[in-house]
Amino acid sequence: NELKPYKIAINQGIEMIMTAHILYPQLDNTTVVSEKTGNEEKKPATMSKAIITDLLKGEMGFNGVVTTDAMNMKAIADTFGQVQAVKLAIEAGADLICMPTVLYSLDDVKNLDAIIDGVEDAVKKGEISESRLDDGCRRILTVKENRGILDWKESDFSLNKALSTVGSANNRATEREISAAAVTVVKNENNTLPVVVKENQKILMLCPYDNERAQMIMGYNRAKEAGLIPESAEVKVVR
């Protein structure tokens, strides 16, 4: 049953699927020695050839692009070094590596260079086959061709166009439409949803981590700008 949504999406031609950094011992219980911890570590789905290559690309017939979730997440970063993590993900069948390192400054580029050098070295040593890289490139280029972005044209993707489009009122309206369409209400007792806010009513918004308050406030302000929240509404942050 867990695979059913993926089967439906694949049959309908979905082009990209993102892996999760979860352990799924029923599908893959293999381990690898971490260069960071020195211990035998179980492979998460992002590093599992059994899940990505054998199951997803093989048995389920997915011909699109497999991208990892952010590799700087603690589930990966606390257990594996950056170079080894990327190599294991590519070897497992990942075609795109999301955030293999964090680039805060020009000095951080050296970390990206080390990752690229590590992958190149792994190919030379036969740890990663050229056919694996060819497969990933083919999948990426196929999606770009299907989307009409195989050839970059400055006139179509200019900085001025980006500045006038990204974050515009129309752009954010489209974001809200996509977000609303992506939500499926499974249970709605007493017709709680949609929430109808009355005058002077208080609404509690929670976020799991302290560093997410800024995003919550940003979302609140954008909703207010769009007229989704009354101008007279106020927000108070409680820590």
Predicted regions, residues:
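Active-site mouth loops of central-metabolism enzymes
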Residues: 1, 72-81
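Short, well-ordered coil/turn segments that N-cap beta-strands
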Residues: 8, 13-15, 60-65, 94-95, ...
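Short, active-site-adjacent cap segments at secondary-structure transitions
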Residues: 23-27, 73-76, 211-213
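Preference for extracellular/luminal or secreted protein segments
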Residues: 48-49, 58, 78-239
